[in-house]
Amino acid sequence: MSLKEWTIMIYMAGDNNLAVDMAYALEQIKGVAEVGAESPNLFVYYDGNSPSIPTLYCDFSEPGKAIYVRSYKVPDKLYPVSNAKENENAADLRSIVNFVDWCVNRVQVEHKGEISYGRRAEKYALIFSGHSLGFQDIGLFKDETSGKSMTMKDIYAVLERLTMCREELDKKADDNKWEGDLRELSTKLLLGQPLDILGFDSCVMGMLEVGYQFSNMTKTMIASEGSVPSAGWTYAKLLGCLAREQNRNLDTPSVAELFVKQFIRTQDAYTVGGVSVDMAAWDLCNFEYLAGAFDELAEVLIKCFKDPASRIYRQMERVILHVHWKCQTYMYDQNVDLGDFCELLDRECGSIAEEIGGNDVKILQEIQQACRQVGEELRRSVILSGFSGGSYQYSNGVSVFFPWSREGYEVSRKNYKSLWFSKLATKKRLSWTAFLEKYLYEVSVRRLELPDEDVPVGSRYRYYSGVKFHEDLDSIMSGNGNSATKIAGQEGSKIAGQEGSKIAGQEGSKIAGQEGSKIAGQEGSKIAGQEGSKIAGQEGSKIAGQEGSKIAGQE
């Protein structure tokens, strides 16, 4: 039996309010197999939130022969899941590894009377469907039955294990370097090669930081900078394209491009309901260069803020604020589109250079050159990006973390600083982290004025109440004073992103003002498919006055 070109595995972490939508998607995927014998190998892991429905392994690879297997009945799993029940914990990284092992090594295949095991292929795609919030670990592929969520480190460990070749497995087993729950010295080959496509049918994963994290383990990544509707990807359209005769010999970038086009076109029909989406396909082989160019930009920006008394310091303080305000944003305005940010920054620096002249022009020109270099690398990295609706119309395919305040940074700092797990990144942390800390903790914060005992009539009387220690005063004078305040990330604070908080004034909302998106799952949302529900729309919203969608990318 000859290898098919593609084995596509879809991991549906639906033990939450996405269960019904994922059940519909499951039927869409099953329908793709009816196209014909040339359809790809199709597998789905489905974990719903009904206690009466067990977690399922589904094989839709052959027309008319859909196979459903209860996960808990699969014997001798590679990595047994602790306290395994009928409803499996989809947020356990071992569940992912076991599912992929079943797809490529264990599923029974009958062909012309002969029995074999596993459906291998020339190319592999792994698509995660569920809740996410970018690099944050808040609600990542949340499993409500177990009360657990995944972490970015979990996903990294999973992809590393899946893609290891025989030599790497043998060496790692000999050196006993397994980490976390994958410490068992298993040398069983899974994919044995980098993923051809890594997809995230979930919110806010289209970040430079996320893509760079996985750039050594996958060739192409498909993700969205903003929110994804609860209904998720239109799998019937996306996967059905692969089964068409004219598309069977497409290379991987062309397949990824096809996914983006089909998703944007199908979602365009829902703009009348206020639905806005974006999606991009990336060539991760170029992400090292994109990250390097972005690193150079961050270093130049840091140079601008060495002397608070300098003219360039004051000018760039205003420029950054202005550009940040106008830029395309995502994730409660905590992320900015990288292309839009650099384009606006380039333009503003050019305007200022014409006005101020002098020695400051040189550093402004350095910023402009760095912005243009980021733009060039971005165009090389983004195979195709697209949007539909008005909310994401300035998207260019890749976003970066840029919160508005030190409080917003503090709530995410631990996760953000732990992102760089790959060998290349641990040698040199990107300077953007240093810029964020410089800008948010010093540049954008007003310094406290010292109290004055001699207060003239009509002025403000400043007085320190209570006892102040020297270290508190030093912190306050440097603009970092957080004493006796409720700072994001501290226990008891009410900052968006903490469990149980009220985000954007809407209790139980998924994302500010949008119902039904796949933002790090919170209870209380309205699920598509239920009577009277609203599917991923904004009631009464106005759509940027544009007909149709705009596909932005490379031919």
Show where each model-derived region lies.
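N-terminal extension/subdomain marker
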Residues: 1-122
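Long, intrinsically disordered low-complexity tandem-repeat segments
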Residues: 485-554
